Each structure stands twice: as C-alpha cells, then as structure tokens.
C-alpha cells in the first residue's frame, strides 16, 4: 500500500543533529516538517559517536586516575577491577536515555512525524521511501534537506576485505575487551580509541602514515606521542598497513615503516582513517544535485544545492564534520529555505577538540598554514610547567601555543595540549572572535589556579618571561 505525505514546508532526510536543529527551527516558525530516517533516530553522535565514546573515555580516565594516583605523595596507586560488559551496558543505557530526551521525545513535543524508511529522490522533486516495515511512501515538500551525515571509510589494503575489522562505529559495540588492538589512523578517532582501550587494559599498537594528530602543531603531535608511549601504547609513525590476513582468531598485519617491513599479530584491527559522506542511493543525479570526490553534496555558502529547493547540512557537505557545525547548519537552512534569509556562517574561529587525556584543542590556523597564506605572524609556546593549575595537579604534561599577527598583536590562533583543553580553547575562541590582541588577552581577568589562566600566561610571554613573575602578576 502506498502512503502519501504531501504539503509539507520542509522534508528532511536523516535524524541527527543537523536534521533536528532544522526541524526545531522550522517548527518554531510555525512550518510543517516531516523527517525520513532509515536507521536509529539520533544520527551518529548520540548513538555511535560522541556520546558513547566520551562516556567510555571518562570511565577509562577514572580507572587510569586510580592507577596514576601515586604522583601525589601519600597516595598509593591501585588498579580497579573492570567488568567490561557492565561498562558497555551502562554506556548503552546512557545512550538510550539521551536518544529519547534529545531526539525522539522532542519530535513528539514539537510535532513532526518521523517516517522510518530509505528515501530516494525522484522527479519533482519528491521522495520515494521504502518503508522499513514494508510498503512504500511518497513525500512532497516545498523544500528538502539532506542531512544524512557520514560513515567510516577504509583505504584499499591487501586482504582487508577478508578480515572482520572494526570501525569507530563497531568499536562502540564490542562486548569483550580486545586483548591486543591494532589501530590504523592517527586522527581524533584513532587517538581517542587508542587511549580508551589502553587504559581499560588492552594492549594497543597505533600505526599512522605521518605523525600523530597530523593536522595539529608539531609540538602537540610530539607531546601526545610521548604521553602515549609513557602509557604503554606502541606507536609507529611514518608507517603504512600494507597487508592483513586472518591468523587464528586474530589478524596478522604487515606494516611498512622507516625500518622496512614488520609483522604485527593482534586480536582486533580498528580502521580509523576517515569518513565519507552518505549519499549513495539518494538519487541525487535525478534532481540535479552534484556531489564531490568523497560523495559530499556540493552546496553554496547558503547551504543550497544546484537545485534551489534542495539543501544540505552537516557531515554530508564539505564543511568540518563536527556535530556543532551540523546543528548550526540545520538552523541556517531553516532560515534560508523558509525565510529567504541568505545567512552564512563564519568558520574562522571554529574550535576543535580531541578528547585524549590530556586533551588536544585548537582554534584558528596552524603556523604552517599562516606561513603558506603569507600572513606575517609571531608565536609563543608556554610549557605547562609554568601553569600553577598544572603544578598543583602534579601533571605538567602539555603546552599552550599562541599565534599573533605581527605588527598588530591580534590573536590569530591558539593550540593547546592540556587537561581541560576544550574549556581553555573556548575562551581563546571568544578572544579571537572579539578581535583581541595578545596584550588585551594578557590584561583580561583570568581566575588563579584554573587551566584557563594558561591563556593569560601564554599571552604574557609575548612581552615577559613568566618564569620570573610572581603568582598572578600582570
């Protein structure tokens, strides 16, 4: 039986952060919305991405904290017992709660329907939907939003199709702790998963083509590599996975690095080399929507495709694949599609965080990017040995690097390796957005014994030797 859904102002494919932000904004405008979702409502972040991974990272950090407690005089380190299935069950419960509170319940509260099925564009444009419970449906709307996100992708590796490898998605579904986990990829997924499983008790080997966190400053890459090695993670830089095959209940991998080939046996292999936009099967060619090399939907600055009635938001576009970008995109599309607002977004001061411990965070361009762009600049790097909060924590691993425009002193970028780096970088984001100079940043109030004080101290290094200043001296 054919179901017909017609007369909507906005039809959305997908149900993640971008989709929900658009739907909420549209409903707040009094517009009608219908959403089509082929899988679990909520998208990547709440189901298999941000929420479950950070929940497990927090648990791993708590366990590691007990193991590392001997850095404080008078405290003896312990090794807490681990019930991995119980940990995963708790994670699943949390995910279910947040999925209900922040997604499915909101759809009911705001009043839009979620059609569960796989959507394909047809002439009109309109959507043809193969319903999950059988049958078909059609959806017609004034405007359409593609918010289908992205999915893990794997490079061509000899034998990879013959082994049961993990991705960032399936790693969150493991019911038993891996004995030895080999991870390919040194981006945020590879780094977070490496430390997560190592701190829970797995033996971890990490292989990367260049350096860890290769999109960050070299000082941060070197710092996190040293920390990983100290925690017992085996790190192979400038290394490629050439071949892999089954080996009993595990895998045998051939790695090629600076010293030639070596073989590594592991119980599990995690591929964390990147993601690809989910656009296959959408029938975009039928409605004049172009895609790029990695399948991303090509959009203009207003997030409109070549078809004036079809828009795209989030990971499915060429823009940075952060959940907060997707959410901002969704609201923007609602404004532009339904109100003709022609709003755009400024990504200049877009912060990013990798939730290792200590964490990595940055905002603005790297020093190499500024040099390539011909922007005259000056830099200062502050070791956490000069930060009171790090000293009382008895953990001075990390740094803060600030980059300022030469001549004006305007803050251009901040790069942080520290506990709480995500919170520190938020303050730096505000400073860059406000156009502050490093001198103004140095003279801005910063509470003593907070990690954010590192920003003030780093700003002071442009004119002072902070090692020779008393506490809080400005």
From Swiss-Prot:
FAD binds at residues 19, 39, 44, 54, 119, 315, 323. Gene3D superfamilies: 3.30.390.30, FAD/NAD(P)-binding domain. The keyword Metal-binding applies. It holds the Pfam family Pyr_redox_dim. One of its GO terms (biological process) is detoxification of mercury ion. Induction: By mercuric ions. Negatively regulated by MerR. Its EC number is 1.16.1.1. One of its GO terms (molecular function) is oxidoreductase activity, acting on a sulfur group of donors, NAD(P) as acceptor. Binds 1 FAD per subunit. Hg(2+) binds at residues 471-472. Disulfide bonds join 45-50. Its cofactor is FAD. The keyword Disulfide bond applies. It catalyses: Hg + NADP(+) + H(+) = Hg(2+) + NADPH. Keywords: Disulfide bond, FAD, Flavoprotein, Mercuric resistance, Mercury, Metal-binding, NADP, Oxidoreductase, Redox-active center. SUPFAM superfamilies: FAD/NAD(P)-binding domain (SSF51905), FAD/NAD-linked reductases, dimerisation (C-terminal) domain (SSF55424). It comes from the Bacteria. Belongs to the class-I pyridine nucleotide-disulfide oxidoreductase family. Homodimer. Resistance to Hg(2+) in bacteria appears to be governed by a specialized system which includes mercuric reductase. MerA protein is responsible for volatilizing mercury as Hg(0). This is Mercuric reductase. It comes from Streptomyces lividans. The gene is merA.
């Amino acid at each position: 039986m054919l179901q017909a859904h017609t007369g909507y102002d906005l039809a959305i494919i997908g149900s993640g952060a971008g989709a929900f932000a658009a739907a909420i904004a549209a409903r707040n405008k009094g517009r009608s919305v219908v959403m089509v979702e082929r899988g679990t409502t909520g998208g990547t972040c709440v189901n298999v991405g941000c929420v479950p991974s950070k929940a497990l990272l927090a648990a791993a950090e708590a366990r590691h904290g007990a193991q590392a407690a001997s850095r404080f005089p008078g405290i003896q380190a312990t090794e807490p017992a681990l019930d991995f299935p119980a940990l995963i069950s708790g994670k699943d419960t949390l995910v279910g709660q947040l999925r209900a509170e922040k997604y499915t319940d909101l759809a009911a509260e705001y009043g839009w329907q979620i059609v569960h099925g796989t959507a394909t564009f047809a002439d009109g444009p309109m959507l043809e939907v193969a319903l999950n419970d059988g049958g078909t449906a059609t959806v017609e709307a004034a405007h359409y939003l593609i918010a289908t996100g992205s999915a893990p992708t794997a490079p061509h590796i000899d034998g990879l199709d013959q082994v049961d490898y993990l991705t960032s998605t399936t790693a969150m579904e493991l019911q038993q702790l891996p004995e030895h986990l080999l991870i390919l990829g040194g981006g945020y997924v590879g780094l977070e998963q490496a430390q997560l499983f190592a701190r829970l008790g797995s033996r971890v080997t990490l292989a990367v083509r260049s350096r860890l966190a290769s999109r960050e400053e070299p000082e941060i890459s070197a710092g996190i590599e040293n920390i990983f090695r100290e925690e017992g993670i085996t790190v192979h830089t400038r290394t490629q996975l050439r071949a892999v095959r089954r080996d009993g209940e595990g895998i045998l991998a051939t790695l090629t690095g600076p010293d030639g080939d070596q073989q590594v046996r592991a119980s599990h292999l995690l591929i964390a080399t990147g993601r690809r936009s989910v656009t296959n099967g959408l029938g975009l060619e039928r409605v004049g929507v172009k895609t790029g090399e990695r399948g991303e939907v090509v959009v203009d600055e207003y997030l409109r495709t070549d078809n004036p009635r079809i828009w795209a938001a989030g990971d499915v576009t060429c823009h940075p694949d952060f959940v907060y970008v997707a959410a901002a995109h969704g609201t923007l599309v609602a404004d532009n599609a339904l109100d003709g607002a022609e709003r755009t977004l400024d990504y200049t001061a877009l912060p990013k965080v990798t939730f290792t411990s200590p964490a990595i965070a940055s905002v603005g361009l790297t020093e190499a990017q500024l040099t390539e762009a011909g922007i005259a600049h000056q830099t200062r790097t502050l070791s956490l040995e000069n930060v009171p909060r790090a000293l009382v924590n008895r953990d001075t691993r990390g740094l803060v690097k600030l980059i300022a425009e030469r001549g004006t002193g305007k803050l251009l970028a901040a790069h942080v390796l520290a506990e709480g780096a995500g919170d520190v970088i938020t303050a730096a984001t505000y400073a860059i957005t406000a156009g502050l100079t490093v001198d103004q940043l140095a003279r801005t109030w910063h509470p003593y014994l907070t990690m954010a004080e590192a920003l003030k101290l780093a700003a002071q290094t442009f004119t002072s030797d902070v090692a020779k200043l008393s506490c809080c001296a400005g």
